[in-house]
Amino acid sequence: MNHTLNEIIKIKNQWFSQHVDVDFPTKESLLGRALFLSDANNRTSYQLKVLPKTNSEYAEDGIFKVDFHRLTVIFSLLQSQRWGSSTDQALVVEFLSQIIFSPPCDLYVGFLQGEPAAAAVVTKYGNSLLVSDIVTTSSNHESFLSTLLNHSSLAIEKYSDIYIEPHRI
């Protein structure tokens, strides 16, 4: 793994962790953080060489940058599906629902036919961008990823290095 990729993953994980670094975090939030970060440390990433063409399964107007609590909850519920036990899922939801919107990470959720169907985290670091924690309710995350990468809110042309850290439900 190259230095930039290591650094951007470290920044993303620190960003997630900081949301429960408060005076009185709940036990559940801390346990959820431990689960989430343990999973994050067991993933592989790759550098994207060619920007994929937008796939028609997800429309750009069906992908939203998370900017209010209800979308945070939807993001949290989608992410929690990565864990098999309902207890672990509840802990991860408790942890992720503490997120406060701030740079360098942005959360995104995707909808298909009005139903939550995908989520991802976008971390920006210099002229590098990491799309991570990609979860989809379908077996193919490529269609969500292609539309997200071409989403007007990302301004992808600003980034010389794009890294992908996939994960499927």
How would you label these PLM feature ranges?
Residues 47-56, 111-113, 128-137:
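Short, Lys/Arg-enriched charge-dense amphipathic segments
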Residues 122-126:
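A short acidic/small-residue loop/turn micro-motif
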Residues 43-44, 87-89, 108-112, 142:
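A short linear-motif detector with a strong N-terminal bias
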Residues 1-60, 162-169:
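Acyl-donor-binding surface of acyltransferase catalytic domains
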Residues 5-6, 81-97, 102, 127-169:
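Acyl-donor binding region in acyl/amide transferases
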Residues 7-12, 43-95:
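Short amphipathic alpha-helix that is part of the acyltransferase structural core
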